[in-house]
Design a protein with these regions (language model features):
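Short, amphipathic alpha-helical interaction segments positioned at domain boundaries
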Residues: 105-115
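Residues within the helices of the helix-turn-helix
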Residues: 64-65, 83, 96
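Short alpha-helical segments that sit at the start of domains
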Residues: 23-52
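Minor-groove-contacting beta-hairpin "wing" of winged helix-turn-helix DNA-binding domains
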Residues: 96-103
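A short acidic, leucine-rich amphipathic alpha-helix
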Residues: 66-70
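Short capping segments at the starts of secondary-structure elements
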Residues: 59-63
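A short, conserved structural fragment
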Residues: 86-96
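Short amphipathic alpha-helical interaction segments
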Residues: 71-87
Length: 115
């Protein structure tokens, strides 16, 4: 096994979802059609802004305002990109702010960080 690839236990330690949020994430993402999902994920993550958003959220909790200040972009455009990441279960909008899911952290750590 490649030691540079982060395993699920490491990913779960980094995830900021609380127990209730994790249960919701697991429920929503349990019936993914992996073939269709892979294609959607590929197309979605080809967008530089979305990759940068996922990096910025990372293992932190980010508010809409923090994201808006960091990206200096129209809030409606940011909401569109955040929505795309949320539909793929890479991030969740929680009461405390945007959080990366285990899937998002896995993608971030195993695919994006090498950029």
């Amino acid at each position: 096994m490649d030691d540079s690839i982060m395993d699920i236990k490491e990913i779960m330690k980094l995830c900021k979802l609380n127990e209730e949020e994790m249960a919701k994430y697991l429920d929503l993402s349990k019936n993914l059609d992996h073939k269709t999902d892979h294609s959607r994920a590929y197309r979605t993550m080809m967008n530089q802004t979305r990759r940068e958003l996922l990096k910025y959220i990372g293992t932190d909790i980010r508010t809409d305002r923090q994201i808006e200040i960091e990206f200096q972009t129209d809030i409606e455009q940011l909401r569109y990109h955040l929505s795309m990441l949320e539909q793929l279960f890479y991030i969740m909008n929680t009461e405390s702010g945007w959080k990366a899911t285990p899937r998002g952290i896995g993608f971030l750590e195993n695919a994006i960080m090498g950029e």
